[in-house]
Structures are given as structure tokens and as C-alpha cells.
């Protein structure tokens, strides 16, 4: 099998990188050299601005020339071009039993050694040059990972080298690394007639079940329904598979349900009968903010008043204090225009998805079409 070697273009970019040595090659970043911040219970790492421009160019080149050519499993949905959260939940709508399993510490559980072992199939282990003795593989691994120092706020992974959440290529790399686990899980599910999809650290499984007694397929809740995915044995099987590469289940986030499953503002209305079509629904909360914004615009309030009523956000600092008023007027207008355009794209994406999969309620589609019309009208008046 042909293995990748770093191109002259990429090596030229690396030569401009602050942490590249003409003798030792790419040096691994440490947590002291990036910005650390908490996002809930997760820790995000952002490269500092003094080297980010070159860092980003290297990321783009790595993706375009190498990582985009490495296969991932079809069950992986997150960070995949052309796929959305709808692709994560839609395959499950014609099933009745659901279980969502969350992986604990997903990104930091992907160590430099795990990446090296996986990427060994794709990147050459020969030296970059007669002068740079570092291998092509080690250069890539060092660039992608982060050494967590004892001074880091990440108490769970101190003195470890991890795939950092927040780095541009980490999502893509995670799908490549997880491919082996995805394949093993997929094979298990194929044997048991279970549907499986994965959105980053969220594993979603569904199946139809056996109906006992006098229950009908139309019943929504009955103890006589049964499915293997709701058993401890199934969870234990997934736990053992994840452990192959050092991943662990977050037991507190396991969700089991029958007929209906709600995840992140989306609901799957399942079916246990081939004659009944399952559906996807979007929570009213997601559309209410659109309706609220349109209502405020119809009341002809100022962009500033609408911004503070509909959105919570920190205000930027004007570069020129003397032009403060114009700066904020432009800011509020652009924010509202961007929100309207974003909501419009979101609604259109749902309609297009429904045209392909026929998975939304017809009344919901009519509602989205009306909202798009109102957004178009609002944008034409701005």
C-alpha cells in the first residue's frame, strides 16, 4: 500500500511554523502554548494568535492533500461534508426501541499513540530528509496532538498527549481513528438487526421489538415489548468494543426509550410496524426564536432593541471610539441580517431533507415554508 509522504508544499509551510526545527522536525505543542477554556465540563484548546495563521494553513493543506483521502465509516455523521444532525437521527425513525450511549472524554481519550497506530497504515515511517530525521508519521502525529502539562486545567489528562478539542483537524481525525470501532459495532448490529449511527461521542442504536400478549403495534408503552438493545448485555457488549481503543461509556448519559426519543431539540417518533411511517420533529423552541425575531421586526423596533431582546451576546469593542455609534449601528444590523439568513438556510435544509427522505410531518413543512416567506419579506425591507 502506498503511504503518504509530506509534499514540498507542506514542508515549506512547516518551515514557516514557529514550532518546526530544521533538524528535529515538528515539535508537539503543550498546553502552556495554547489558550485553554472550559465549555461546560469539556475543555477547549485554541492555538495562540501569534502562530495561528500558519497553523491554519498547515491544517488546510493536511486535510486537502491527505486526511480527506483516508476512509471513515458510513455510520459517522458529525464533521462529514454533506451530512447533518438529521442524517444522524433519520435512519432510526422506522424503529421502536432506542438507546443513546455517550462516550466519556471522547477527544482526550484519543492519545498520540492511538493516532500513531492508526495513521501507520497511511503515513510513511521513513525520515523526512537526510537532515530532518523525524519520520513523516511522527511529524503528523506531533502536529495533531497536544501535551497536557501538570499546570493545565485538565486534571483528568495531565502528563498525557491527546487529540485536543478545539484544534481544526481534531473532528476529522476522530472519525478516522474511530473507524475501527465503528466497523466492529456495525458488524454486531448487522447480526442483530440493529440500526447504528454516530455523531462524534453520541452513539445511537435502534431496533424493532417483539410484541407479546394482546398488545397491538400501535401501542406506545407496554411492558410486553422487548428489545435486546435495552438489556445490560447489549451495553456490556458496546462497552467491551469501546475498550479496545481505550474509550469508556458515560453511564450517567445513557438514554433508553420506546416509540419516542428526544435529543438536542429533535424528536424521533418511531414505529414498530412496516405500515406506519416514523417521523422526525423539531422542537418548538427552535422555531420560536425565529418567530420572536420576526415579531419584533414587524413591530418596527430598532436593531439594537431587537438584538438585546432576542439574543444574548457580548458586544465587541469599537476600534475607533470616535466612530462608536456607527460601529454599533452596523454591528446590530449585520447581526440581525446574519441571523435571518442563517434561519432561512436552516429551514430550507429541513425542507430539502424531507424532499429526499419524506420524514417530516406535512404540517411542519408547511410551517417552515411560511416562516421562509416571512423571512424573505423581512430581508427585502432591510
Language model feature labels by segment:
Residues 181, 186-194, 208:
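Long, contiguous secondary-structure blocks with strong helical propensity
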Residues 170:
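Active-site-proximal polar cores
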Residues 205-211:
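Short beta-strand-to-loop capping motifs
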Residues 173:
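Conserved binding-pocket/active-site segment within a compact domain
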Residues 195-199, 253:
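Short beta-strand
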Residues 1-101, 106-117, 121-131, 141-167, ...:
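Right-hand nucleic-acid polymerase module
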Amino acid at each position: 500500500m502506498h503511504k503518504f509522504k509530506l509534499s514540498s508544499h507542506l514542508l515549506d509551510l512547516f518551515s514557516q511554523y514557529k514550532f518546526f526545527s530544521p533538524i528535529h522536525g515538528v515539535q508537539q505543542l503543550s498546553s502552556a502554548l495554547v489558550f485553554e477554556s472550559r465549555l461546560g465540563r469539556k475543555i477547549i484548546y485554541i492555538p495562540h494568535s501569534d502562530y495561528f495563521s500558519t497553523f491554519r494553513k498547515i491544517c488546510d493543506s493536511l486535510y486537502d492533500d491527505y486526511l480527506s483521502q483516508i476512509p471513515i465509516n458510513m455510520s459517522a455523521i458529525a464533521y462529514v461534508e454533506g451530512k447533518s444532525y438529521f442524517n444522524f437521527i433519520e435512519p432510526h425513525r422506522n424503529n421502536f426501541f432506542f438507546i443513546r450511549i455517550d462516550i466519556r472524554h471522547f477527544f482526550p481519550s484519543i492519545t498520540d499513540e492511538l493516532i500513531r497506530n492508526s495513521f501507520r497504515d497511511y503515513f510513511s515511517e521513513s525520515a523526512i530528509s537526510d537532515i530532518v530525521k523525524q519520520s513523516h508519521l511522527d511529524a503528523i502525529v506531533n502536529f495533531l496532538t497536544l501535551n497536557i502539562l501538570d499546570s493545565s486545567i485538565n486534571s483528568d489528562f495531565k502528563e498525557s498527549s491527546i487529540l485536543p478539542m478545539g484544534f481544526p483537524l481534531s473532528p476529522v481525525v476522530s472519525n478516522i481513528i474511530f473507524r475501527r470501532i465503528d466497523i466492529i459495532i456495525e458488524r454486531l448490529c448487522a447480526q442483530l438487526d440493529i440500526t447504528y449511527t454516530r455523531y462524534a461521542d453520541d452513539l445511537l442504536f435502534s431496533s424493532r421489538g417483539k410484541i407479546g400478549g394482546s398488545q397491538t403495534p400501535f401501542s406506545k408503552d407496554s411492558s410486553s415489548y422487548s428489545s435486546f438493545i435495552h438489556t445490560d448485555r447489549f451495553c456490556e457488549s458496546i462497552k467491551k468494543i469501546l475498550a479496545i481503543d481505550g474509550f469508556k461509556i458515560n453511564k450517567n448519559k445513557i438514554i433508553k426509550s420506546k416509540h419516542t426519543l428526544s435529543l438536542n431539540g429533535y424528536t424521533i417518533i418511531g414505529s414498530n410496524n412496516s405500515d406506519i411511517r416514523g417521523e422526525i420533529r423539531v422542537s418548538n423552541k427552535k422555531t420560536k426564536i425565529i418567530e420572536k425575531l420576526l415579531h419584533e421586526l414587524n413591530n418596527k423596533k430598532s436593531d439594537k432593541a431587537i438584538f438585546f431582546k432576542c439574543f444574548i451576546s457580548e458586544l465587541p469593542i469599537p476600534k475607533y471610539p470616535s466612530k462608536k455609534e456607527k460601529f454599533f449601528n452596523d454591528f446590530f444590523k449585520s447581526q440581525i441580517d446574519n441571523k435571518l439568513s442563517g434561519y432561512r438556510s436552516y429551514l430550507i435544509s429541513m425542507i430539502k431533507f424531507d424532499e429526499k427522505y419524506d420524514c417530516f410531518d406535512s404540517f411542519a413543512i408547511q410551517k417552515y415554508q411560511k416562516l421562509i416567506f416571512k423571512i424573505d419579506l423581512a430581508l427585502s425591507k432591510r
